[in-house]
Amino acid sequence: MSKRGTRTPGYWYDNTPIPLPARILAPVYGAAIALRRALYRRGWRRRHRVPVPVIVVGNVTAGGTGKTPLTIALVVKLQEAGWTPGVASRGYGRDDAGTARWVEADTPVALGGDEPVLIAWKTGARVRVDSDRLAAARALVEAGCDIVICDDGLQHYRLARDVEIEVVDGQRRYGNGRLLPAGPLREPAARARDCDFRVVNLGQASATAAPQVPDDAGFGEWQMRLSIDSVQPMDGKRAQPLSMLAGQRVHAVAGIAHPERFFAMLRARGIGVVPHAFPDHHVYRAADFSFGSRLPVLMTEKDAVKCRPFADEWLYSVPLKAELPAAFWVSLLDRLNKLASRQGV
């Protein structure tokens, strides 16, 4: 992978001044995306449908909000319900972004992208990376999938969809409320009202948050909890309970959109964290782990798939599980079953 990762501009989420070039470019960007969406809504650009239900998971903000844990949870739940889901993804950060390919658990991250490889590794589902999400969806259907999950595809209007799920960071929300590059918004925040479901990633904080009750149509702020309870040695040994590290110091590594969230989850389990934050989608080298002290190194699974070539007995991945209310799954599966009956799937 040639990309070295991405960092979020601070002014998106705090009160620091927005650079003048960003303020000038934001209205231009806004006009362009408004025109593009209008072309699709009025039928001047065609949306293409595949013969199975399509779920789009995405967000109106740039950067990570928890889409990958939710996508993994969706795949697993659909598999349990008897579906054969496939995942369509762009495969951000891979070296040959113009090449479409199947991604499996052992696909090099440089070819498949960190998130698609993680999804394939965790679920065993068919995963197709392609800059053309429609082509990816068609390939998945041809491969026998009876439902397609389009990861990070909210703005990919060429692919018609049956269900849209918006994922929101429960702490940052929509930041300063401005469009790119002055703020984090890919589209105006009002775009989220068109989505069928809104999943709010509250991390561990959701354990004390008041529940939100969605309306009868299924739309509402469904809360997603992220939980950790084990560590997986990256040298192939059996997983161990995370509690075995309580009271110990560890190096914690996170190359994700919001590294502090991962560090806070470890601290909440009584672990002494020496934090090491890297840019989102960072490409790791063995030298990145020369910390000067020999302590266990804990990292997210998204980071772990990129460190497999040089893993040793000191490296551990921390499985992350997305938990949503039972009512969310009932509402979603009911909608999908109705769609399938109409489409003859």
UniProtKB/Swiss-Prot annotation:
HAMAP family: LpxK. Pathway: Glycolipid biosynthesis; lipid IV(A) biosynthesis; lipid IV(A) from (3R)-3-hydroxytetradecanoyl-[acyl-carrier-protein] and UDP-N-acetyl-alpha-D-glucosamine: step 6/6. InterPro entries: LpxK, P-loop_NTPase. GO terms for cellular component: plasma membrane. Transmembrane segments: none annotated. ATP binds at residues 61-68. One of its GO terms (molecular function) is ATP binding. Transfers the gamma-phosphate of ATP to the 4'-position of a tetraacyldisaccharide 1-phosphate intermediate (termed DS-1-P) to form tetraacyldisaccharide 1,4'-bis-phosphate (lipid IVA). The gene is lpxK. It catalyses: a lipid A disaccharide + ATP = a lipid IVA + ADP + H(+). It comes from the Bacteria. It is an enzyme of class 2 (transferase). Belongs to the LpxK family. The lineage of its organism: Bacteria, Pseudomonadati, Pseudomonadota, Gammaproteobacteria, Lysobacterales. This is Tetraacyldisaccharide 4'-kinase. Pfam families: LpxK (PF02606). Keywords: ATP-binding, Kinase, Lipid A biosynthesis, Lipid biosynthesis, Lipid metabolism, Nucleotide-binding, Transferase. It comes from Xanthomonas euvesicatoria pv. vesicatoria (strain 85-10). Its EC number is 2.7.1.130. GO terms for biological process: lipid A biosynthetic process; lipopolysaccharide core region biosynthetic process.
